[in-house]
């Protein structure tokens, strides 16, 4: 199936080694659609390694996702009566809640062009988030032994990735001005007793549209990407 290119920024030379397609849908996207698009582009990169990489920046309609091997014990509702769709997917980590007001980034990158090391990649995604928050005069923090980002001991961003022959999918989710009630239906990321936060709690009135260009630029800078048209 073709990738929905959505909104593209100014094209550059698609032969550039850091070229990447930027996909920014205007409306909230059903999870199944974005997952299919990621897998499609991942497969294309496996078959044609010279192609540009791709990054999706979007919001999801409300849903819950469970990583590989995630325990359903972290769901506080019966699976046959979920408050929103539930998807078991091919990423690491436990349960995550997606919804409007949360900015999601899905980089489909070939780590062989950088460093074929998933631990390195996870730390780089955390650094992207730290860089974004710094632009807002907020100091994001890592917690030892955990993946994601915290502000004042409240988790504001979740990270979970999948990888096939060093080509990534899935990514990160940053809570900006989303409702938090849906997180009470699960144990987010399997971390009992850890509070969830959103950036608007620190910066009243902050909108997702203000943060999206910061995340776009931080990803481009960290992974040396130049946005381009579809190959």
Curated annotation (Swiss-Prot):
Keywords: Acyltransferase, Cytoplasm, Transferase. Belongs to the LipB family. The record marks 155 as: Lowers pKa of active site Cys. It is found in: Cytoplasm. One of its GO terms (cellular component) is cytoplasm. Its main location: cytoplasm. Pathway: Protein modification; protein lipoylation via endogenous pathway; protein N(6)-(lipoyl)lysine from octanoyl-[acyl-carrier-protein]: step 1/2. NCBIfam families: lipB (TIGR00214). Catalyzes the transfer of endogenously produced octanoic acid from octanoyl-acyl-carrier-protein onto the lipoyl domains of lipoate-dependent enzymes. Lipoyl-ACP can also act as a substrate although octanoyl-ACP is likely to be the physiological substrate. Residues 49-227 form the BPL/LPL catalytic domain. Its EC number is 2.3.1.181. GO terms for molecular function: lipoyl(octanoyl) transferase activity. The active site is at residue 189. In the reaction, the free carboxyl group of octanoic acid is attached via an amide linkage to the epsilon-amino group of a specific lysine residue of lipoyl domains of lipoate-dependent enzymes. It catalyses: octanoyl-[ACP] + L-lysyl-[protein] = N(6)-octanoyl-L-lysyl-[protein] + holo-[ACP] + H(+). Substrate binds at residues 91-98, 158-160, 171-173. It comes from Parasynechococcus marenigrum (strain WH8102). GO terms for biological process: protein modification process. This is Octanoyltransferase.
């Amino acid at each position: 199936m073709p990738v929905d290119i959505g909104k593209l920024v100014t094209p550059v030379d698609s032969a550039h080694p850091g070229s990447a397609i930027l996909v920014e849908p205007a409306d909230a996207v059903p999870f199944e659609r974005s997952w299919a698009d990621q897998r499609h582009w991942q497969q294309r990169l496996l078959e044609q390694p010279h192609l540009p990489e791709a990054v999706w920046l979007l919001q999801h309609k409300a849903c819950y996702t469970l990583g590989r091997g995630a325990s359903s014990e972290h769901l506080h509702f019966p699976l046959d009566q979920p408050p929103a769709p539930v998807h078991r997917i091919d990423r690491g980590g436990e349960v995550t809640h997606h919804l409007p007001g949360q900015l999601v980034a899905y980089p489909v990158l070939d780590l062989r062009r950088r460093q074929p090391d998933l631990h390195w990649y996870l730390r780089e995604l955390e650094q992207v988030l730290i860089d974004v928050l710094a632009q807002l005069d907020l100091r994001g923090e890592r917690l030892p032994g955990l993946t994601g980002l915290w502000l004042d001991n409240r988790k504001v961003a979740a990270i979970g990735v999948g990888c096939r022959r060093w080509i990534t999918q899935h990514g990160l989710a940053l809570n900006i001005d989303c409702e938090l009630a849906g997180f009470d239906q699960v144990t987010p990321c399997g971390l009992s007793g850890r509070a969830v936060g959103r950036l608007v709690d620190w910066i009243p009135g902050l909108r997702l549209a203000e943060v999206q260009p910061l995340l776009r630029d931080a990803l481009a800078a960290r992974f040396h990407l130049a946005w381009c048209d579809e190959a």
